[in-house]
């Protein structure tokens, strides 16, 4: 209800136009379109019956439901309906005044081309005349909306790594074979094709990739592996172990050579002395040039053989060595026999010197008359015992030539501490 308490306005005095609220651009276009339709309806009423072609019946263009729904949702549907009703009043009055005249037909409105409709919808809202309650056209107060130009988003291309300066392209790097076109796969799916081996491979040399034949590359890698296997890195332990094994082989040779020399020495002595040592003077005269060289060689071989035999025995643990000797262990027995033979050979070294200096006419004090036999008999017996001891030692060591207890102690002590590994010392 309107408040009528205010002073009444005079009929002759026109009311000032009331300012309407700003209308959105879409609603404004819709209202202008409705106003144009109402004006065209008024013009159609004024046209005569003869001017309207009969072949074209009147068709009333209905508004789209979407425009009415949009107008009603924005709250401006009532003004549009009221304006439509006001615009339709004059034709009804004329029909009442002239009831006999036939109802005039309206002309078919020509639909503007799509270019104009597009320009009409895209054009910014122009100030249109709207009618207020008194029927006076008034311009709505609305700020012109300037459409903002849309900027097309440019796709950022990933920066390509600049490796052209570092990696050069050579003629041999370019493959002349026909290359099949690669199918475009999605980024996150693995290719389903099976890779085929290529005859050429690219190897980086001095910060550049060079083409090389696959077969030649495989040969070079195999040669490198073989050379690495042939020349392993040696440690101090490996050198000591190799020297120890080499000396063991030399000692084994000296054992056999010493046994042969001792037996030969004994045979020569008994042959030169005759039966029952009856010709001692002949022994002294014939054995004189052989005394020094042969006794020196015999002493050298005895020393090497004794050290080699001791090297095979574990003397770091005295109790273990004594137990092995009492158990008649071959290496322990050979060591004891060689040491005994060396002591006996040294005990008869003075007699060997006297044999070397045998001259009855010059050195009569060294060899007195009838004193030759008592001096030579012990020397002959000692040489016989040395030959027997050396021969037995050689037989004991020949029974087990690869046995070396000191090697197991010095180089394979970690194997003894962890017997569960099942590793044994190599001979």
Swiss-Prot record:
Pfam family, one: TMEM237
Disordered: region residues: 1-172
Membrane association type: Multi-pass membrane protein
Chief site of localization: membrane
Sequence ranges of Basic and acidic residues compositional bias: 75-87
Listed transmembrane segments: 252-272, 290-310, 325-345, 375-395
Residue ranges, compositional bias (Acidic residues): 43-52
GO CC entries: ciliary transition zone; cone photoreceptor outer segment; microtubule cytoskeleton; nuclear speck; photoreceptor connecting cilium; plasma membrane; rod photoreceptor outer segment
Feature: compositional bias, Polar residues: 28-40, 118-131
Function: Component of the transition zone in primary cilia. Required for ciliogenesis.
Family: Belongs to the TMEM237 family.
Protein name: Transmembrane protein 237
Gene source species: Mus musculus (Mouse)
Lineage of the species this protein comes from: Eukaryota, Metazoa, Chordata, Craniata, Vertebrata
């Amino acid at each position: 209800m309107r408040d009528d308490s205010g002073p009444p306005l005079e009929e002759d005095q026109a009311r000032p136009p009331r300012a309407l609220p700003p209308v959105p651009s879409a609603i404004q276009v819709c209202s202008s379109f409705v106003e144009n339709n109402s004006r065209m309806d008024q013009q159609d009423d004024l046209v005569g019956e003869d001017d309207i072609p009969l072949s074209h019946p009147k068709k009333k263009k209905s508004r789209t439901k979407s425009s009415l729904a949009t107008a009603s949702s924005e709250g401006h549907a009532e003004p549009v309906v009221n304006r439509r009703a006001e615009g339709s009043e004059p034709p009804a009055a004329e029909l009442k005044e002239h009831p006999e005249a036939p109802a005039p037909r309206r002309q078919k409105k020509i639909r503007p081309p799509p270019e104009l409709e597009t320009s009409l919808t895209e054009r910014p809202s122009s100030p249109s005349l709207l009618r207020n309650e008194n029927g006076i056209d008034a311009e709505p107060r609305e700020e012109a909306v300037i459409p903002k130009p849309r900027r097309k988003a440019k796709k950022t291309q990933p920066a390509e790594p600049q490796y052209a300066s570092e990696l050069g392209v050579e003629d041999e790097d370019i493959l002349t074979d026909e290359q099949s076109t690669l199918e475009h796969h999605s980024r996150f799916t693995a290719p389903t094709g099976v890779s085929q081996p290529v005859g050429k491979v690219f190897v980086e040399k001095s910060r550049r990739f060079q083409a090389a034949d696959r077969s030649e590359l495989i040969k070079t890698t195999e040669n490198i592996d073989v050379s690495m296997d042939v020349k392993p890195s040696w440690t101090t332990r490996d050198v000591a172990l190799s020297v120890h094994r080499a000396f063991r082989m030399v000692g084994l040779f000296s054992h056999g050579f010493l046994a042969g020399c001792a037996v030969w020495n004994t045979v020569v002595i008994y042959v030169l002395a005759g039966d029952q040592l009856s010709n001692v003077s002949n022994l002294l005269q014939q054995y004189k040039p052989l005394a020094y060289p042969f006794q020196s060689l015999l002493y050298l071989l005895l020393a090497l053989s004794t050290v080699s035999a001791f090297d095979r025995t574990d003397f770091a643990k005295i109790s273990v060595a004594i137990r092995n000797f009492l158990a008649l262990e071959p290496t322990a027995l050979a060591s004891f026999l060689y040491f005994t033979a060396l002591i006996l050979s040294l005990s008869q070294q003075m007699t060997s010197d006297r044999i070397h200096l045998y001259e009855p006419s010059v050195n009569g004090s060294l060899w007195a008359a009838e004193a030759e036999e008592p001096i030579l008999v012990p020397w002959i017996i000692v040489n016989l015992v040395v030959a027997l001891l050396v021969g037995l030692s050689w037989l004991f060591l020949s029974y087990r030539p690869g046995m070396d207890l000191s090697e197991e102690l010095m180089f394979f002590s970690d194997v003894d501490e962890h017997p569960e590994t099942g590793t044994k010392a190599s001979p």
